[in-house]
From Swiss-Prot:
Purpose of the protein: Functions by promoting the formation of the first peptide bond.
Name used for this protein in its record: Translation initiation factor 5A
Statement: the UniProt record of this protein carries the keyword Secreted: no
Domain of life according to the entry: Archaea
Chief location of this protein within or outside the cell: cytoplasm
Keywords: Cytoplasm, Hypusine, Initiation factor, Protein biosynthesis
Length: 124
């Protein structure tokens, strides 16, 4: 699995973290100051990269969490049928089918950028 461990205090807004076993992009990060006998706590909120579900995480700032290594790749649209597009990876020429986001207009020969993590893909 392409992921690494980091301390919660090293996380930043806009980066990725694993929450509930799925990669999420961090929307907000806040810390509560430490109490008399405890350590500072961090609250992390984010949206799932591939499923857009909202998730949150509350941990001490020195706790370790998994950070996914999400690859950003280039592809070319081969064909578009309905809401699906056939994409060819420009690095290894592998073809696969992906769902086209509703807010994007695609036509054959367009070059796109997509995210990939453990077989899951999403057009950016």
């Amino acid at each position: 699995m392409p992921r690494e461990q980091k301390q919660v205090r090293e996380l930043q807004e806009g980066s990725y973290v694993m929450m509930d076993e799925s990669p999420c992009e961090i929307n907000s990060y806040s810390t509560a100051k430490p109490g008399k006998h405890g350590s500072a706590k961090a609250r992390v909120e984010g949206n799932g990269v591939f499923d857009d579900r909202k998730r949150s995480l509350s941990q001490p700032v020195d706790a370790k969490v998994w950070v996914p290594i999400i690859e950003r790749k280039q592809g070319q649209v081969v064909s578009v049928t309905g809401s699906d597009a056939q994409i060819m990876d420009l690095d290894n020429y592998q073809t696969f089918t992906m769902r086209v986001p509703e807010d994007q207009d695609m036509s054959p020969d367009d070059e796109i950028e997509y995210l990939e993590y453990e077989g899951q893909r999403k057009i950016v």
